[in-house]
């Protein structure tokens, strides 16, 4: 069936002492939320509607031209995102972790970001502009599927003998995807229509677990999808006016 969402939001924008602030509080009333779960031990997945769910939270953004050459910004959000209904199977058991009060999948409760740009008062190498950028992002813990927050969800037994394995081996994993921090740095110079940028993304080589993938309900492949490792590179751009 069709999913519907009714959004209620109130926001405030203010400017004081050089700061610009945007703050918003919201409540989303979700009807017939579409949820997808693994279909037992086969490779298929099932989708169904959950009668009631909600997300509510607070978002903010603060920016300031701190000096003539330095710009800073801060942003963040706190979100409660939960089921307000319980779905059960024919035996009366809760289906795939879809229970009143359980968290919705893939939604972190907290996210924060800081970014800054510094433009040199006297650009280097006779360039038109020389600048430094830094950005930091924090993402809170999450679940890939609603069922991942059920007790015992991280216990997998394949039941299949293969390559010397009996199939009775137990693999134990924590399916609560942990929070992570990413720091990116870059420096650039501009010569007329040309721009050169040296960047280091994921400076501390954070191994962020973005989601968990299980094949055949965990009887086959078990793997985490991760972020890009530390990456160093150079970008050249030409701006057409």
Residue ranges and their predicted role:
Residues 18-21, 69-72, 123-125, 193-198:
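Repeated loop/turn-to-beta-strand initiation elements of outer-membrane beta-barrel proteins
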Residues 1-5, 16, 41, 51-55, ...:
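Transmembrane beta-barrel outer-membrane domains
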Residues 1-58, 77, 81-84:
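Membrane-embedded beta-barrel scaffold of Gram-negative outer-membrane proteins
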Residues 31, 125, 137-157, 188-241:
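C-terminal beta-signal and adjacent terminal beta-strands/loops
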Residues 27-29, 48-146, 235-239:
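Gram-negative outer-membrane beta-barrel transporters
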Residues 6-10, 21, 56-60, 110-114, ...:
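Hydrophobic, lipid-facing positions within transmembrane beta-strands of outer-membrane proteins
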Residues 35-49, 83-102, 143-173, 210-224:
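Solvent-exposed loop segments that connect transmembrane elements
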